């Protein structure tokens, strides 16, 4: 009898295996169901094996149903099946069931394998649950799951995406302390995150040992992030030195490397160096892309007549398929700066005829130009078009309008735009605050400017050198010298210096007030 039962059980298992092999999963489910409801005993092995099949086939609802049927029988999954189940559920983001499985594993004294652990961490970070990801990470470590370099990299990436720069650096340090060696992906996560947060010096310092020792073969992604970071910080010599070092160690600069340098050179009018980089690209066999040509167009717009720039776009860029919204926006801004708003608007219409999707930058240039000319009706029409297209004004747009209104003496309207910006959950930066503070000070409304200055500090938007200069200038004009001196002290505490002419004016005004007294 025992042999007969065993033979029947083996026959069921064989039928299920053959059906699975043939891709007939629904039929396999029917046979497994038949087996479960027969008089022949089904073992934990059978449940583990079949749930594993269902997970592999992404039949998660069936796998869940069978799992809950299995539990009251006193059966459990083995750690491997639990881990595969959790990994699969991460694809469909079924957090409730994942939590239940993790809880069951903890009760049984199991921990997920490193693959499931990392997949779950990655899901939490991608779903903006980075705080819970960190908590889960340390909880698993306490239970004996040793994280690998992938685990740390996932957390570092997630923390940087969430803007938690200090926490990301601490996770990196924890990785080093634990003896886990960083690889290229870990270094890239750290460097890209820090450079994005404008902390290029810290980024370089933290991977300098890997760069010098060549323990890790760093990719162009790491070097490009550092080069871009140094360029943004205005330290081109450091960027160029890194680019030279790349070539020496056999990590050849790529198109991104050259484009980053080109962008800096053209922005800073370093035309000879830009030409040298272009020549080097040709020698290296690197083909220019749309970004490269847009940098060239930007260069032409700085030194040539706008019409020549337009000809360059039509003759050199358009035949290569490199003429895009960036190209047109660059030209529109150039014609607007040259007070040729009609030509700029014709280019705008040309874009529409070609079916190009305009962006906020395009509209910002035109709206600013028409406002400058006093043509508010066209500016309003363009703003309405923006809204219809679903283009939300960004910080640059609002700041541009703010600056124009303040310079035109329309400070009350500017205040309205500033409040509208906040209502739309766009956080003003130092440039936005400076535009309004400057306008208020020029209008003799220094008390309101001071209030805005204090509000700025309360919002953790650090006043820069210009902010202090505007406030001090307004206080001097309002003959509030005592307050001006206090702000000057704050300015010096921040490491900023006052222009010689402003400091002289402040001292002279003080002397004059003393003499009158």
UniProtKB/Swiss-Prot annotation:
Per-repeat ranges for PPR: 8-42, 43-77, 78-112, 113-147, 148-182, 183-218, 219-253, 254-288, 289-320, 324-358, 359-393, 394-428, 429-463, 464-498
Top-rank taxon: Eukaryota
Subcellular location field: Mitochondrion
Transit peptide location: 1-57
Keyword vocabulary terms for this entry: Mitochondrion, Repeat, Transit peptide
Family recorded in the similarity comment: Belongs to the PPR family. P subfamily.
UniProt-recorded name of the protein: Pentatricopeptide repeat-containing protein At1g13040, mitochondrial
Lineage: Eukaryota, Viridiplantae, Streptophyta, Embryophyta, Tracheophyta
């Amino acid at each position: 009898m025992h042999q007969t039962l065993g033979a029947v059980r083996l026959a069921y298992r064989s039928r299920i295996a053959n059906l699975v092999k043939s891709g007939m999963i629904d039929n396999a489910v029917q046979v497994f169901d038949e087996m479960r409801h027969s008089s022949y005993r089904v073992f934990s092995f059978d449940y583990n094996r079949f749930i594993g099949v269902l997970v592999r086939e992404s039949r998660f609802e069936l796998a869940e149903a069978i799992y809950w049927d299995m539990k009251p029988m006193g059966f459990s999954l083995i750690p491997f099946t639990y881990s595969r189940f959790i990994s699969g559920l991460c694809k469909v983001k079924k957090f409730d069931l994942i939590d239940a499985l993790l809880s069951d594993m903890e009760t049984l004294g199991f921990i997920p394998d490193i693959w499931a652990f990392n997949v779950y961490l990655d899901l939490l970070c991608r779903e903006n649950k980075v705080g819970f990801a960190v908590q889960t990470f340390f909880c698993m470590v306490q239970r004996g799951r040793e994280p690998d370099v992938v685990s740390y990299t996932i957390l570092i990436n997630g923390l940087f995406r969430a803007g938690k720069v200090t926490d990301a650096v601490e996770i990196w340090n924890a990785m080093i302390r634990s003896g886990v060696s960083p690889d290229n992906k870990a270094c890239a996560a750290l460097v890209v995150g820090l450079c994005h947060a404008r902390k290029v010096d810290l980024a370089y310092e933290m991977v300098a040992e890997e760069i010098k020792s060549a323990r890790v073969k760093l990719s162009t992604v790491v070097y490009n992030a550092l080069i871009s970071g140094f360029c943004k910080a205005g330290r081109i010599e450091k960027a160029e030195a890194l680019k030279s070092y790349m070539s020496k160690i056999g990590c050849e600069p790529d198109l991104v490397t050259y484009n980053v340098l080109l962008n800096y050179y053209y922005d800073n009018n370093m035309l000879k160096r830009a030409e040298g980089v272009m020549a080097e690209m040709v020698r290296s066999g690197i083909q220019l892309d749309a970004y490269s040509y847009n940098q060239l167009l930007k260069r032409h717009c700085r030194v040539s007549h706008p019409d020549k720039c337009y000809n360059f776009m039509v003759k050199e860029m358009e035949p290569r398929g490199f003429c895009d919204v960036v190209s047109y926006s660059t030209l529109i801004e150039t014609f607007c700066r040259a007070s040729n708003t009609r030509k700029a608007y014709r280019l705008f219409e040309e874009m529409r005829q070609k079916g190009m999707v305009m962006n906020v930058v395009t509209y910002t240039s035109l709206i600013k130009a028409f406002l400058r000319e006093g043509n508010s009706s066209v500016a309003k029409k363009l703003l309405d078009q923006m809204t219809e297209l679903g283009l939300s004004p960004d910080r640059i747009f609002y700041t541009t309008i703010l600056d124009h209104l303040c310079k035109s003496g329309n400070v009350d309207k500017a205040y309205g735009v500033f409040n509208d910006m906040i209502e739309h959950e766009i956080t003003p930066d130092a440039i936005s605050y400076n535009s309004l503070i400057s306008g208020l000070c020029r209008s003799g409304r220094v008390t309101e400017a001071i209030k805005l200055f204090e509000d700025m500090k309360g919002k953790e938007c650090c006043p820069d050198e210009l902010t202090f200069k505007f406030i001090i200038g307004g206080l001097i004009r309002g003959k509030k010298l005592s307050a001006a001196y206090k702000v000057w002290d704050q300015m010096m505490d921040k490491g900023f210096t006052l222009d010689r002419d402003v400091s002289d004016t402040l001292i002279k005004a003080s002397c004059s007030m003393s003499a009158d007294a």
